[in-house]
């Protein structure tokens, strides 16, 4: 009987954990706010290596009235953290486009609004298209279980170049600039 109750308890815990995961009909107003870049992956390694054009670190996402998303990122240029502001336009449910290092189409794969968000991007630059997968969290780091979930997703999509950004300088010292604070006012 005790074993049965233990199993039932574990099932309820797992079901509760999974019920918070949103994979469709995402309420973008709930993803507005502060985020941290945790993991980054691409099928073109040089894009995410140090000084790679797609090695950017998110600070803030804001849902705009027209359903677009504005992003505040930081990147390292010549050893210094530089802010980048981008606006991604919504094309259909959960699909966005933005021009940065080529033409990009991305979707929100899944989110737990108060914990993490997983984005999958296709970039069409002049040389060759590539995939990029980004994992952001509300806190500076996440559990090993979530990191393993990200790795599994990447492997299922043929992406083997994966970086744990919690182990590098993510320009955390540059967060909270006056411009970024102004953009977070709702």
Swiss-Prot record:
Hey, which family's this protein in? Belongs to the calycin superfamily. Lipocalin family.
Species: Felis catus
Q: What is this protein called?
A: Allergen Fel d 4
One GO molecular function term of this record is: odorant binding
Q: Which SUPFAM superfamilies match?
A: Lipocalins
* Cellular location(s): Secreted
Q: List the disulfide bonds.
A: 81-171
Would I find Transport among this entry's keywords?
yes
Task: Summarize tissue expression.
Answer: Abundant in urine (at protein level).
List the InterPro entries hit by this protein, alphabetically.
Answer: Calycin, Lipocalin, Lipocalin_CS, Lipocln_cytosolic_FA-bd_dom, Maj_urinary
Q: Which positions are glycosylated?
A: 51, 66
Record keyword Ion transport present:
no
Q: Where would you say this protein principally sits, based on its record?
A: secreted
Q: What does this protein do?
A: May be a pheromone carrier. Acts as a kairomone, detected by the prey vomeronasal organ and inducing fear reactions in mice.
| Taxonomic lineage | Eukaryota, Metazoa, Chordata, Craniata, Vertebrata
One Pfam entry for this protein is Lipocalin
Signal peptide coordinates: 1-15
Q: Which GO terms describe its cellular component?
A: extracellular space
Keywords per UniProt: Allergen, Behavior, Disulfide bond, Glycoprotein, Secreted, Signal, Transport
